[in-house]
Amino acid sequence: YAGALAREARPGQFVHVTCEGSQLCRPISICVRIPDGGMLRLVYEVRGTGTAWMSHRCAGDTLRILAPLGRGFTPPEGAKHPVVVGGGLGVPPLLELAKSMRAPTALLGFRSARAAILTEDFQRGGAQVEVVTDDGSLGRKGLVTEPLKERIAAGKCDYIAACGPLPMLASVAALAREAAVPCQVS
């Protein structure tokens, strides 16, 4: 139960989770907030002892968290063609943002079909979803910046929010800057 934190959190913010046996907190992006139920949905990949410890928690277990942290996304009012661009574990913090937008496009990039997450959640939330995988095992083969270039060239992109690996973010920011499209990266 996250109580007021679920009401205060904004799309793109994150939490610090204190993991047993570790001095360090794990930063985990907020995927979905459920204000009425006072809950936050966190999506993460097990990569070390902290996230391994988290993966053994069960429903009803208590976690110590510090939240909400970070600025979050603040899309401009009235965007007609908003686009969210996510890569890998940068996809979860964009879900809540996409759900808050009118007719968003979600360009989601993954290593493979096996690594793909939340695509149906984005669709249920009202987004037009295009998946790109490095190996072509799901959706289109290539980089997630390719369909973004196409949308910009077609005039179907007037705001971009992106989250993912640094090289992807640098490419997205450069495309946005070149086309004078408002862009936020995280």
Predicted regions and their residues:
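FNR/FR-type flavoprotein reductase catalytic core
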Residues: 49-186
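Ferredoxin-reductase
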Residues: 1-59, 111
